[in-house]
Amino acid sequence: MKIGTVRTVPIFALAGIGLVGASLWLFISIAGEVMEGETAAWDRRLLLALRSAADPALPWGPAWVQEMARDFTALGGVAVLTLMTAAVIGYLLFAGKRHAAIAILVAVAGGLILSSLLKLGFDRPRPELVPHGSLVYTTSFPSGHSMMAAVTYLTLGALLARVEGSIRIRIYLLSVAVLLTVLVGVSRVYLGVHWPTDVAAGWAVGAAWALLCSLVMSRLQRRGEVEPPDTTTRSPRC
């Protein structure tokens, strides 16, 4: 078992580092294209594709679809993500996993700070092509909702997946995290408050940050500096 563990850990670590690098490369590529104005036509086409053909001022679909989009977009808002993160941190503290709680706090708070700095740095205006379906207070690139959804849901999904012994349940947990992240991002374009490239960039840099934090947490767990998941009552199963 020890031999298998020694061989497996570096493989997963290298794969994770590769994914972090790929996500950062994607973000940098999108940012470069946006700054050069190469994505303007593509952004415009995709945004209008989600609007009514008869009246582009209206989002596609009936009123209940628009209401669902607002519900989905709220899942990436600061209030919802703060409450969710606080609940998880509270659970970890009650479970005696103080260092794990600190790691989650650093991951989410660090992502929020990074998102704010990137917005200030790029200072891209919001779309004015269609009316906004949600109130906005900051600049457009990258999408803060999309980025923070990726940071929070992927980080928490990875945390829960480590506790679970079943491969199928691990896949399910990570799939739910990805689905929530995608729904938040698509809703931002649907509501006309972000260009598609804002969302894609938010996903890319958010995933990179979440993966990096997950790799660091795994490393600290192996060194005993962060409490490992409690798997004493679970056995790996398919």
Question: What kind of region is each of these model predictions?
Answer:
Residues M1-A79, G121-F122, R126-H132:
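N-terminal transmembrane-helix/juxtamembrane module of multi-pass inner/ER membrane proteins
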Residues T73-T82, R98-A103, M147-M148, V182-V189, ...:
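Short, charged low-complexity intrinsically disordered segments located at boundaries
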